[in-house]
């Protein structure tokens, strides 16, 4: 195996010719499969050793008894040192209280925080509430205003909030993002802090979604539509901004060639090494998804773990796993800080899971991989204008969470009819390891809902074991030629276009091209009929809510616009002038059988346990079930899940996130399921563990809806042992 990046001279020239240095005119030619085949099959980035391994700083696991951030702590470990609830007594866990916000029904993906016996959490009606953590009774409620720019994410604390204790100058505060603002609230009253920004909030230009971190007095957070920011946690003044898509002569700008400079978003989350002042960011796939012809190159800092100086925003290092990602294989979750043993020494590392099924394990200071990181020669594209990266990740250690590719032997055998139904789809599709897209033909891969998701991982600090929930769901995406004509700007918009701008453009974009997380509507007439569109407008689906109330005439006009009927005069589109405008795709679809179950063999959802000292998976068990299939005699299949796990010193792993609306407790050592309880709605965030009034609680956000599906609600549910139950600490 050759050490990357030591290419032989003639092969180095070939690799460079396939990289981001291509002139736009050359980019229209087909990729050279013969030149790609001359490259070595494997390359390897060597493992860190010697001085590149950072000795572990002192850390006291027993100190992890609070929940000051939605990810548990600044290192996103989701570990609790509490042990009143443990393997011996978890079977007696019961509901302690349920809080209903009563202000609507909405999917919430935020884990509450708990400080000093008070819980802070967002509600379905766009408020932040403070609850008595022991009883669930409301202490205060703050109503968050609508964002000034409706295209920005508008749920308060969508994926997290953080408590800052303050300092000699500033009082404690709750910090979170909402829409195009960062808010600072008084934890005691819920009132915005007047000395922070403008009346308790400061502008966040690219929208908010993740839970920030605080280093000394710098609050670091990320924008939904790109970039990472450092704010003064006292005053709200912006201190620095790091461009996740480099600009001008910034490092990495030459890895984007072409007109389609989309985003590379940190929507998975951040972590902080408080002692070293290093912020770690998980960066998602470059945009637009699936179509890379307008963004030739490796597309830094897409699909990277990025380390920044927390005080200045200066880049310290980055590690990119998927290059020129055209499959939406984000590093989707907050990096997790942990300690492992290498070369007989305790080493501080950072771990990050991806939708490609890769578990990155890197030294915190050098950024080098803890294990050799193998790359494999990747296929070339048949899509005119596309330029795939010569190599993609194929690591041996840590073992894959799940393979990124669909294989024919994966096809479901649930019933003969289900098998035949799926095989009919496979026969008309392309598939394979990092197989690029072909025009007009579905591509099957484990991607948009595969591997490790935004719910991320947790770590058992004393053992170094990492727990991650995962999905085995096959994406089915077709790239199509965008051959529509452009509307002549000399004519006024139709009534349907006006309705689209009012009701749809906020998510699908003014040009119907989507925004990377929302599918495009260009070419929708080729995949949906009038009845299907009308039904979708009226009922919504998954993360899409029903369209706002509109009269029949307005609805008909909107459908005409979407189906390209009765439109104003047009003129031919300028073919090939923009890589992004050459192609569109048919949405975020999945391979399913005749009854809507995943089109591959189970398990479809898993809880995985890693020993990261060795990089090996110790155990994995199905997560979730379809009771009707269990009754038919099928072993537990697992379900699609988006929630994440939390581990405790009681030897337990708690997680929800499944389609069956359950929360479960597993034995952290063996994976045995020890307890479960049904929730009023699905629990699509990780549980928090805390102590209030001398009693240990486990709380879960239970609001349903979202990408896993099911009805939406408004609940938080807390569990505890009965008051009379004897303590049995391990």
Residue ranges, per PLM feature:
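Blade-edge beta-strand/turn elements of extracellular beta-propeller
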Residues: 95-98, 141, 187-205, 234-259, ...
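Blade-level signature of beta-propeller repeat domains, shared across WD40, Kelch, NHL, RCC1
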Residues: 464-469, 473-480, 688-730
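Conserved blade-ending motifs and adjacent loop-strand segments that build the rim/top face
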Residues: 323-326, 331-334, 376-380, 444-451, ...
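Beta-propeller blade signature
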Residues: 227-237, 298-312, 365-366, 606-611, ...
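Short, conserved, GDST-rich strand-edge loop motifs in beta-rich repeat architectures
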Residues: 170-172, 226, 281-300, 473-488, ...
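N-terminal pre-domain segments of enzymes
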Residues: 28-81, 388-414, 573-583, 727-730
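Repeat-blade elements of multi-bladed beta-propeller folds
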Residues: 64-71, 106-127, 153-181, 206-228, ...
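Extracytoplasmic electron-transfer domains, predominantly the class I c-type cytochrome c fold
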Residues: 218, 278, 490-494, 498-506, ...
């Amino acid at each position: 195996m050759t050490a990357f990046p030591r290419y032989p001279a003639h092969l180095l020239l070939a690799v460079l010719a396939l990289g981001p240095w291509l002139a736009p005119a050359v980019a229209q030619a087909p990729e050279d499969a013969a030149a790609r085949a001359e490259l070595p099959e494997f390359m390897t980035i060597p493992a860190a050793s010697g001085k590149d391994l950072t000795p572990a700083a002192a850390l006291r696991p027993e100190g992890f008894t609070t929940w000051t951030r939605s990810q548990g702590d600044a290192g996103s470990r989701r570990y609790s040192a509490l042990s009143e609830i443990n393997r011996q007594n978890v079977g007696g866990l019961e509901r302690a209280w349920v809080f209903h916000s009563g202000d609507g029904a909405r999917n919430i993906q935020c884990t509450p925080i708990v400080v000093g016996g008070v819980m802070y959490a967002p509600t379905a009606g766009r408020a932040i509430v403070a609850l008595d953590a022991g009883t669930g009774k409301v202490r205060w409620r703050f109503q968050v205003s609508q964002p000034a720019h409706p295209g920005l994410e508008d749920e308060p604390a969508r994926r997290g909030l953080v408590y800052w204790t303050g300092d000699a100058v500033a009082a404690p505060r709750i910090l979170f993002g909402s829409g195009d603002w960062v808010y600072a609230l008084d934890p005691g009253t819920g009132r915005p802090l007047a000395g922070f920004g403008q009346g308790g909030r400061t502008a966040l230009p690219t929208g908010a979604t993740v839970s920030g971190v605080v280093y000394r007095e710098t609050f670091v957070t990320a924008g939904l539509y790109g970039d990472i920011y450092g704010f003064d946690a006292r005053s709200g003044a912006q201190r620095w901004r790091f461009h996740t898509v480099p600009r001008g002569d910034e490092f990495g700008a030459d890895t984007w060639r072409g007109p389609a400079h989309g985003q590379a978003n940190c929507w998975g989350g951040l972590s902080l090494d408080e002692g070293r002042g290093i912020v770690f960011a998980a960066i998602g796939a470059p945009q637009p998804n699936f179509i890379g012809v307008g963004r030739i190159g490796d597309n830094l800092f897409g699909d990277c773990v990025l380390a920044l100086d927390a005080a200045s925003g200066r880049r310290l290092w980055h590690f990119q796993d998927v290059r020129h990602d055209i499959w939406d294989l984000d590093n989707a979750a907050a990096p997790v800080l942990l300690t492992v043993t290498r070369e007989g020494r305790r080493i501080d590392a950072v771990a990050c899971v991806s939708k490609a099924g890769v578990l990155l394990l890197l030294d915190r200071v050098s950024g080098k991989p803890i294990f050799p990181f193998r790359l494999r020669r990747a296929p070339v594209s048949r899509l005119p204008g596309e330029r795939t990266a010569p190599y993609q990740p194929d690591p041996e250690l840590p073992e894959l969470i799940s393979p990124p590719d669909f294989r024919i032997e994966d096809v479901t055998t649930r019933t003969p009819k289900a098998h035949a139904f799926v095989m009919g789809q496979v026969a008309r599709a392309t598939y394979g390891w990092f197989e690029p897209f072909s025009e007009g033909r579905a591509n099957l891969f484990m991607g948009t809902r595969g591997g490790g998701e935004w719910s991320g991982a947790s770590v058992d600090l004393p053992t170094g074991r990492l727990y991650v929930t995962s999905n085995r769901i096959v994406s089915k995406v077709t790239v199509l030629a965008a051959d529509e004509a452009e509307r002549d700007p000399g004519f006024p918009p139709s009534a349907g276009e006006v309705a689209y701008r009012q009701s749809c453009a906020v998510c699908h974009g003014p040009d119907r091209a989507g925004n990377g997380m929302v599918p495009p509507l260009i070419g929708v007439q080729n995949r949906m009929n009038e009845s299907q569109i009308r039904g979708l407008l009226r009922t919504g689906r998954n993360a899409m809510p029903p369209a706002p109330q509109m009269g029949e005439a307005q609805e008909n006009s909107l459908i005409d616009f979407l189906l390209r009927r009765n439109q104003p005069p047009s003129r031919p589109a300028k073919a090939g002038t923009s890589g992004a405008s050459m192609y569109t795709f048919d949405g975020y679809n999945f391979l399913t059988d005749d009854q809507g179950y995943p089109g591959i063999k189970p398990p479809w959802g898993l809880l995985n346990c890693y020993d990261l000292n060795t990089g090996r998976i110790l155990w994995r068990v199905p997560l979730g079930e379809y009771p009707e299939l269990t009754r038919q005699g099928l072993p537990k299949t697992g379900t699609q899940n988006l929630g994440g796990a939390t581990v405790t010193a009681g030897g337990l792993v708690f997680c929800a996130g499944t389609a069956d609306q359950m929360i479960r407790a597993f034995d952290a050592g063996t994976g045995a399921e020890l307890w479960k309880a049904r929730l009023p709605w699905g629990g699509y965030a990780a549980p928090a563990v805390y102590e209030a009034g001398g009693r240990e609680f486990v709380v879960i956000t239970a609001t349903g809806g979202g990408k896993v599906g099911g009805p939406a609600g408004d609940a938080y549910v807390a569990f505890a042992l009965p008051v009379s139950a004897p303590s049995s600490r391990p």
